């Protein structure tokens, strides 16, 4: 059988040889463009085992396949030996997409082998090369011959990686509070730099304030859950850290939510008390605040404790071991599957759903993000401006700096472009994540981009990064924006683009880490399955659009208060995102949009998001992250099927020539005329959700009402 490991070092090669029946049962295949490392090549030259070297470019696909069949017919396993290409840290595989695609549509079955290399410490818990603490080799079930065999092999690797990570020493019996205390005391002089008042708080003092806050929480509430209504800043970090230390479930509230959404979240989570800040309640007056008696003003409470108590706890931390300090502070020891926090979905299609996040999920999320970043503890600085009610805000803005030993710079407003640019330049920030609207504000304030030159990673989170914004950042400022794809159910992201690795050795093959239109490769520990639009079964052609399903240690398995039997989005260990996308042979994920944002026209699926971009071009209008000008929805047709409708703020009234403009604009772009909306409806504004995404349900109901279509 054809055996396809994701990566191989000499130790793995020898173990594989044993597992497959010894050297008389194995033939090794080496492809010249991605040859194995020096140790393997020396071993092959010394032992002269059965096998062959080839070059697809020079000898052609047919020749290579004939050599594979020759050894298979002789009763041997043919094992592909991947090389050591340049790519992102902790990548899934060392096999380039073109080499995997070699076996597509052939009569060859394949057995994927996933080789996992792990360390017992946080900074490099997942690695791809020596040295490592432990090696796991998983022989996956054979993949049947046929179309897109290479992409199906990738899917098997991802599932095997998830199974291995579940047994990682850090995740099998995690104690997140203990790890946080140990990490902070290991880097006590790291600082939280507050961008509002330019104050600095050492992590040792931050831990002391969090320990004091655990007592405040216990005094005010005996409930298992507590709400946190705070923006990014030192009080938000202290409150979330205190909840983890106290074993209390933190529910970070979206303070841009509507009153109806806020009431729904409070009832769903069963909240009675909320941690906040006096200044923030005065600033955020439009928010539907709870009664004052239900609010815990953390700034006032800590002020009443006195600075002497803070200094006492800080002094205690200097002379006690982490275990002694935890015992003295009565730090909780929660189980790995105890709920640490609750996030809520954005409510794009329905009311926000509560997502319980366990301690194991949080730690797995931080590990997967840390392993993908080439940052140095003790000198690199992270910018924290994404609110903690978003998974990226909690994981990347709070836990990653604390566990990784990085300074963090906080600021409460993600769209304060001028101030954020100044903070990035002042503190030489290396990592920043922001929403597309916040990024646009930063680029506008940056002028020539030099103030952002220290950024090694500039991630776009929260909503889709427009091609126009990404290209403008690259062309005008020389800044690569890294698109990510996330959901509230998968922490911190499902996938993220990464910068290309430095290439001092130009002869080494470089695997893609980002591509226009893609959201990058799935993070370590996230398995992606592409299915049909109406079935949870894996697609035989994952490189064609289908529903995106996920599983992994940082992916939820349930919703708050909803059994899995009542949720069509949960199927075994898999979670359905409701998004449509596909995987490329080189492991990059493309997300096309929500399932509801596609219209079925015969055999064709028309993506609304892509159609909206085309309509903006037809009307020569620039997209605005803060105010939508148009939206496309799908409504039932009176003759059966579906019809496309364009809601437009660009029209006060619609005349027949408007339909011709759209129709000719679509066909001039070599698209079918069926892409032209059947109806154009003038509206005063396009409804959006607090997270900035389209309020599709309101748009749909409004379109049906205007067209007098009755809904069940």
Where are these regions (language model features)?
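A cross-family acyltransferase "interaction/gating" segment
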Residues: 41-42, 76-80, 84-148
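Conserved C-terminal "lid"/linker of ANL adenylate-forming enzymes
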Residues: 599, 633-634, 645-647, 662-712
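AMP-binding/adenylate-forming catalytic core of the ANL superfamily
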Residues: 432, 552, 557-558, 573, ...
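Conserved pre-ATP/AMP-binding loop-to-beta segment of ANL
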Residues: 188, 231, 296, 304, ...
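Gly/Ser/Thr-rich phosphate-binding loop
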Residues: 15-16, 308-320, 429-434, 443-513, ...
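Conserved AMP-binding/adenylate-forming
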Residues: 215-257, 380-388, 605
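Conserved ATP/PPi-binding loop(s) of AMP-dependent carboxylate-activating enzymes
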Residues: 518-525, 533-568, 604-607
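Conserved AMP-binding/adenylation subdomain of ANL enzymes
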Residues: 363-381, 391-430, 445
């Amino acid at each position: 059988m054809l055996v396809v490991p994701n990566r191989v070092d000499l130790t793995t090669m020898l173990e594989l040889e044993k597992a497959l029946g010894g050297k008389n049962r194995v033939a090794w295949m080496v492809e010249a463009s991605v040859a194995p490392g020096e140790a393997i090549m020396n071993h092959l030259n010394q032992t002269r085992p059965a096998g062959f070297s080839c070059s697809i470019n020079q000898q052609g696909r047919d020749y290579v396949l004939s050599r594979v069949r020759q050894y298979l017919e002789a009763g041997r396993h043919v094992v592909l030996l991947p090389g050591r290409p340049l790519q992102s840290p902790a990548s899934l595989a060392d096999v380039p997409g073109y080499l995997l695609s070699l076996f597509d549509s052939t009569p060859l079955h394949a057995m994927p082998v996933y080789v996992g290399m792990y360390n017992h410490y946080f900074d490099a818990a997942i690695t791809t090369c020596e040295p490592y603490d432990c090696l796991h080799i998983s022989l996956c079930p054979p993949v049947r011959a046929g179309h897109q065999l290479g992409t199906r092999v990738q899917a098997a690797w991802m599932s095997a990686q998830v199974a291995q990570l579940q047994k990682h020493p850090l995740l099998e019996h995690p104690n997140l509070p203990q790890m946080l205390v140990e990490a902070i005391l290991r880097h006590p002089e790291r600082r939280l730099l507050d961008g509002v008042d330019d104050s600095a708080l050492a992590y040792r003092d931050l831990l002391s304030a969090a320990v004091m806050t655990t007592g405040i929480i216990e005094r005010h509430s005996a409930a298992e859950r507590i709400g946190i209504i705070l923006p990014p800043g030192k009080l938000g970090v202290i409150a979330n850290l205190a909840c983890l230390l106290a074993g209390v479930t933190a529910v970070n509230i979206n303070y841009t939510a509507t009153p109806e959404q806020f009431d729904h979240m409070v009832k769903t989570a069963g909240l009675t008390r909320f941690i906040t800040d006096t200044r923030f309640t005065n600033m955020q007056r439009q928010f539907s605040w709870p009664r004052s008696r239900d609010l815990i003003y953390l700034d006032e409470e800590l002020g009443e404790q006195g600075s002497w108590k803070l200094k006492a706890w800080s002094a205690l931390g200097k002379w006690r071991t982490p275990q002694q300090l935890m015992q003295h502070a009565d730090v909780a020891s929660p189980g790995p599957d105890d709920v640490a926090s609750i996030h809520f979905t954005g409510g794009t299609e329905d009311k926000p759903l509560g997502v319980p996040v366990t301690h194991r999920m949080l730690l797995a999320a931080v590990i997967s993000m840390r392993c993908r970043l080439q940052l140095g503890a003790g000198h690199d600085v992270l910018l924290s401006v994404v609110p903690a009610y978003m998974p990226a805000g909690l994981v990347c803005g709070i836990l990653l700096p604390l566990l990784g030993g990085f300074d963090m710079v906080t600021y409460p407003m993600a769209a304060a472009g001028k101030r954020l640019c100044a903070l990035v330049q002042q503190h030489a920030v290396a990592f920043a994540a922001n929403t597309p609207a916040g990024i646009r504000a930063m680029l506008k304030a940056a002028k020539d981009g030099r103030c952002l030159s220290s950024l090694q990673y500039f991630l776009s989170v929260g909503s889709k990064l427009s091609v126009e914004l990404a290209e403008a950042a690259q062309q005008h400022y020389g800044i690569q924006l890294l698109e990510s794809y996330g959901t509230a159910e998968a922490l911190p992201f499902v996938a993220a683009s990464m910068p290309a690795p430095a290439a001092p050795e130009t002869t080494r093959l470089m695997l893609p880490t980002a591509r226009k239109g893609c959201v990058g490769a799935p993070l370590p520990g996230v398995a992606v399955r592409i299915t049909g639009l109406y079935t949870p079964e894996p697609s035989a052609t994952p490189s064609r659009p289908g529903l995106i399903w996920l599983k992994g240690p940082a992916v939820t398995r349930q919703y708050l208060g909803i059994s899995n039997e009542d949720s069509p989005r949960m199927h075994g260990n898999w979670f359905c995102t409701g998004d449509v996308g596909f995987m490329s042979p080189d492991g990059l994920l493309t997300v096309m949009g929500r399932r509801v944002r596609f219209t079925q026209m015969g055999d064709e699926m028309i993506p609304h998001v892509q159609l909206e971009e085309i309509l903006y071009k037809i009307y020569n209008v620039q997209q605005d992250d803060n105010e939508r000008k148009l939206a496309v929805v799908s409504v039932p047709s009176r003759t059966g099927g579906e019809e496309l409708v364009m809601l437009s703020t660009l029209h006060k009234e619609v005349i027949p020539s408007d339909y011709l403009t759209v129709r000719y604009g679509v066909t001039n772009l070599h698209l079918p005329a069926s892409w032209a909306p059947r109806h154009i409806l003038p509206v005063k504004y396009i409804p959006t959700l607090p997270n900035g995404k389209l309020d599709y349900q309101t748009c749909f109901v409004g379109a049906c009402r205007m067209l007098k279509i009755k809904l069940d």
